[in-house]
Amino acid sequence: MSTPRFDFLILNGPNLGHLGKRQPEIYGATGLDAVPGQVQTLMGDAAGDIQLDFFQANSEGALIDRLEQAYEARTDGVVFNAGAYTHTSLALADCLAWVKLPCVEVHISNIWARSEPLRHQSYIGRHAVGVIAGFGIMSYALAVQALYHHINNA
């Protein structure tokens, strides 16, 4: 097996530490542990080019710290589900603006189909190369694939 060429951070915000168990009617019954296998199925041999590093925090400061660490480590890209901070955090948006890491915003549910109007806005998306939402846990694998293609075609 070859050495991965790309390091991607899979960053998850508040209340996303129990995916697969938390509100399965909204977020599905599959957890993040399924993502590497989904990436392999979706991308085939190209999946071997990617190292995935998963991090979840319930606090805004810890997410900012991890983004800054990714910047310092020259991480190649970020798949970011900021959870509720998507709709409220100027601090995370400001961090993404300065670290300038290629980022795909990801959501398990379709935030624009949710009933709460606040969930229809994103401070994260304006600093992302793209947004993937509404495909359950598969949204993460789709985001990894999109980020990989974005970086390879930049």
Residue ranges and their predicted role:
Residues P4-F8:
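Extreme N-terminal starter segment of soluble prokaryotic enzymes
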Residues S89-A91, W98, G134:
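Active-site histidine-anchored catalytic micro-motif
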Residues A46-D94:
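Helix-adjacent hinge/juxtasegments
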Residues L96-R114:
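Short, acidic/small-residue loops that bind anionic groups at enzyme active sites
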Residues P14-L16, G83-T86, S109-I111:
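Short glycine-rich anion-binding loops that position phosphate/pyrophosphate groups of nucleotides
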Residues A70-E72, L96-W98, H120-R126:
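Short, hinge-like loop/turn segments at secondary-structure boundaries
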Residues D53, V104, A113-A154:
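Short, glycine-/small-residue-rich phosphate/pyrophosphate-handling segment
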Residues L19-A34:
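Glycine- and acidic-residue-enriched helix-capping/strand-helix junction motifs
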